[in-house]
């Protein structure tokens, strides 16, 4: 059974990236299943840290992007989600190639959600494991919609 409470597709997801950090890092959504979202990000000069390896912050951007977007599509039209906490363990260095992140829910509650995001290299080896906690907020009448819904 699908966890999505709003229309979701790769076309919709990739359209939300326009003029954002997501677009700047060339993060591309690649798969939506009944309970997960995946995206890729290149490991290259604009995602490197000074030693020429994948910057941990870039991995966290990918993780938070996947978890936040997934959370926002899992709530109804009367709600939206905002990040409360994120952690990441960087377990493998990368110098070039493509990483793929996949977000799956660990908990979808009324007021909070917890998402696990695994980031792997092209050989399927774990590069980073992250956990994102979000708050579920209720929209008020006439309240501006989050960017992902505009």
From Swiss-Prot:
InterPro entries: HotDog_dom_sf, PAAI_dom, Thioestr_dom
Enzyme superclass (EC): hydrolase
Domain of life (superkingdom): Bacteria
GO cellular component: cytosol
CDD domains linked to this entry: PaaI_thioesterase
Keyword set includes DNA repair: no
Keyword annotations: Hydrolase
GO molecular function: 1,4-dihydroxy-2-naphthoyl-CoA thioesterase activity
EC code: 3.1.2.-
Family: Belongs to the thioesterase PaaI family.
UniProt name for this protein: Putative esterase VC_A0580
Organism: Vibrio cholerae serotype O1 (strain ATCC 39315 / El Tor Inaba N16961)
């Amino acid at each position: 059974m699908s966890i999505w409470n709003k229309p979701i597709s790769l076309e919709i997801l990739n359209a939300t990236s326009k003029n954002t950090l997501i677009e700047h890092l060339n993060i591309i959504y690649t798969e939506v299943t009944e309970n997960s979202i995946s995206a890729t990000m290149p490991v290259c000069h604009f995602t490197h840290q000074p030693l020429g390896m994948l910057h941990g912050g870039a991995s966290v951007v990918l993780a938070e992007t996947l978890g936040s977007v997934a959370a926002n599509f899992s709530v109804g039209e009367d709600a939206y989600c905002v990040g409360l906490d994120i952690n990441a363990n960087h377990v493998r260095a990368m110098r070039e190639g493509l990483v793929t992140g996949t977000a799956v829910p660990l908990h979808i509650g009324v007021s909070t959600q917890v998402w696990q995001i695994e980031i792997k290299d092209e050989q399927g080896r774990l590069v980073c494991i992250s956990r994102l906690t979000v708050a579920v907020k209720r929209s008020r009448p006439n309240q501006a919609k989050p960017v992902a819904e505009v």
